[in-house]
Amino acid sequence: MNNISIKCLKSEKIQSGACHGQFLINSLNPGQGITIGNQLRRVLLGDLGGVAISAVRIAGITHEFSTIPGVREDILEILLNLKGIICTSQIQDTQFGHLKVQGPSVVTADLIQLPPGVEIINPNHYIATISTSNILEIEFKFEYGSGYHLASQNFVEEDENYLQLDTIFMPVQKVDFKIENIYDATNNISERLFLDIWTNGSISPNDALESAAQVIIDLFTLLINNKNINNNNRLELKPETISIEPYTNIAIEELQLSVRAYNCLKKAQINTVGDLLQYSPEKLQELKNFGRKSADEVFSTLKNKLGIILK
């Protein structure tokens, strides 16, 4: 195993309190970059949880198609504005907040009376404008969850007096990664992984990365610690029986071949590793403009990245 290292290349706040971080993971073995990158991306976007407003009760309002006298926005517009409020909390229990404002006034998120432990990341976020002396009174339901929940999924009988919101719980908004090959003095290949994480500001990219890594560790720890595994029934895998099926759907772009080799393969309608494996070395070299040098490059890449040898 190489001496893997990780460092933060960039950490910055962008508009509306959102955050961006870029990380570099060095000294990975060939093939590990895409494995780690894909796994982290899935967990960052799908498994990390957060707190959000899931429902509201507005005084004098029974359905979302109503209007409030003296308030510029209708109820649908107010609900849409409330979806943009970003919250953070260390408490995962359902909690309630309250807002009561008399006009004329511009109503923003910082006017909400929050429950203990809940913090609003974008306090200047706009909610509504009251143009008369009327009162706008709203009760907020704060819930912890993960992913994206439609308003229809949030409804429970006890909430019949509440208006449900489409709720975005996930604190990570976007994840990108790219892999670069590094050659040492003896022409051995290692990989480095660049990982970019954008969050809504309720969690830092660094904390998000640590949390995602911990989720993955916990998952595989369960497999390691499973005492119900019957050691007597372990399968002994022999090299010749290893399946290459998991690699067949990998696009040839992931192999990061030279432009010449890549273009020749694409012109021959070879789009995936699975397509490539249908060719013997001799048949591969029969492709138009595909010389010995390109063939050697493909053979070497398949062996070093995926452990596959064409026969």
From Swiss-Prot:
Gene3D superfamilies: 5' to 3' exonuclease, C-terminal subdomain (1.10.150.20), DNA-directed RNA polymerase, insert domain (2.170.120.12), RNA polymerase, RBP11-like subunit (3.30.1360.10). Signal peptide: none annotated. GO terms for biological process: DNA-templated transcription. This is DNA-directed RNA polymerase subunit alpha. It is found in: Plastid, Chloroplast. The keyword Transcription applies. It catalyses: RNA(n) + a ribonucleoside 5'-triphosphate = RNA(n+1) + diphosphate. DNA-dependent RNA polymerase catalyzes the transcription of DNA into RNA using the four ribonucleoside triphosphates as substrates. GO terms for cellular component: chloroplast; DNA-directed RNA polymerase complex; mitochondrion. Residues 242-311 are annotated as: Alpha C-terminal domain (alpha-CTD). InterPro entries: DNA-dir_RNA_pol_insert, DNA-dir_RNA_pol_RpoA/D/Rpb3, DNA-dir_RpoA, RBP11-like, RNAP_asu_C, RNApol_insert_sf. Belongs to the RNA polymerase alpha chain family. SMART domains: RPOLD. In plastids the minimal PEP RNA polymerase catalytic core is composed of four subunits: alpha, beta, beta', and beta''. When a (nuclear-encoded) sigma factor is associated with the core the holoenzyme is formed, which can initiate transcription. Keywords: Chloroplast, DNA-directed RNA polymerase, Nucleotidyltransferase, Plastid, Transcription, Transferase. The N-terminal domain is essential for RNAP assembly and basal transcription, whereas the C-terminal domain is involved in interaction with transcriptional regulators and with upstream promoter elements. GO terms for molecular function: DNA binding; DNA-directed RNA polymerase activity; protein dimerization activity. Residues 1-227 are annotated as: Alpha N-terminal domain (alpha-NTD). It comes from Phaeodactylum tricornutum (strain CCAP 1055/1). Its EC number is 2.7.7.6.
